[in-house]
């Protein structure tokens, strides 16, 4: 696994990102990214971090496939991942429990040939 902090122009931490469950023999990995403060979202930090992580996964580590999962309630993240080139593969129904209610969990992926 690889983990990095996401920082603003002044070096303040705004989030984190990582490649998890890297399986070189299978050429696949999972990606995670979180910028928890709504004030720091939609400022380009996520886009820059995602571009760096996908470049690392596909070019440095020669992965063929990168997967990501997101709670269906997080429509902003779903749209962001689609903008970055991820495609929905499936839905885990009622797989996430938050504030007394269940929500679906959306599985997405991007293949190396689809990146840039």
Predicted regions and their residues:
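Acetyl-CoA-dependent GNAT
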Residues: 1-39, 111-114
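Conserved GNAT acetyl-CoA-binding A-motif
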Residues: 59-69
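Conserved acetyl-CoA-binding loop-helix of GNAT-fold acetyltransferases
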Residues: 42-56, 75-83
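Terminal substrate-recognition subdomain of acyl/acetyltransferases
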Residues: 101-116
